[in-house]
Amino acid sequence: MNFLAHLHLAHLAESSLSGNLLADFVRGNPEESFPPDVVAGIHMHRRIDVLTDNLPEVREAREWFRNETRRVAPITLDVMWDHFLSRHWSQLSPDFPLQEFTCYAREQVMTILPDSPQRFINLNNYLWSEQWLVRYRDMDFIQSVLNGMASRRPRLDALRDSWYDLDAHYDALETRFWQFYPRMMEQASRKAL
């Protein structure tokens, strides 16, 4: 899962959206640095990552990547799940339009920015203003996201080519998304994530 899915599941679970978004920017034990609700959100994010990576649908999807891109498949798939969520948002969350949800999420996250790591602050400088969560529905933007990640971290250069794996298996990936994501939504609503 990437930014949108973590925020969505946090909302369904009535967990800290701030903590769920912040989690990838925090190493080790967050309890000394953040308030309890944010810490709980960070832990929820970490549980979701472990759960998602071990889902049979996700393990199967990783096998569809070519040898030269399989190492970055987990990252690429996280971004792709956000694509499907953004694309099908009106079906999955009909009572909370994506644009409104994005504004709501931004308001929640802004409350912790003064005490956040600089990399997280940098992310927030463009995540909201460039409308990433809405633009995830566009595959050209997904390609741009993967290229941007590869540019910032040269050891992840294979992300550029992983776009071709997504394109080659688009329909099958979408099917897998529909197989697992509604289950995760239900688990989040029951606070079981």
UniProtKB/Swiss-Prot annotation:
S-S pairs: none
Domain of life: Bacteria
Catalysis performed (reactions): holo-[ACP] + H2O = apo-[ACP] + (R)-4'-phosphopantetheine + H(+)
Keyword annotations: Fatty acid biosynthesis, Fatty acid metabolism, Hydrolase, Lipid biosynthesis, Lipid metabolism
TM ranges: none
Its EC number(s): 3.1.4.14
GO BP field: fatty acid biosynthetic process
GO molecular function: [acyl-carrier-protein] phosphodiesterase activity
Similarity comment: family membership: Belongs to the AcpH family.
Its job: Converts holo-ACP to apo-ACP by hydrolytic cleavage of the phosphopantetheine prosthetic group from ACP.
Protein name: Acyl carrier protein phosphodiesterase
Organism: Escherichia coli O6:H1 (strain CFT073 / ATCC 700928 / UPEC)
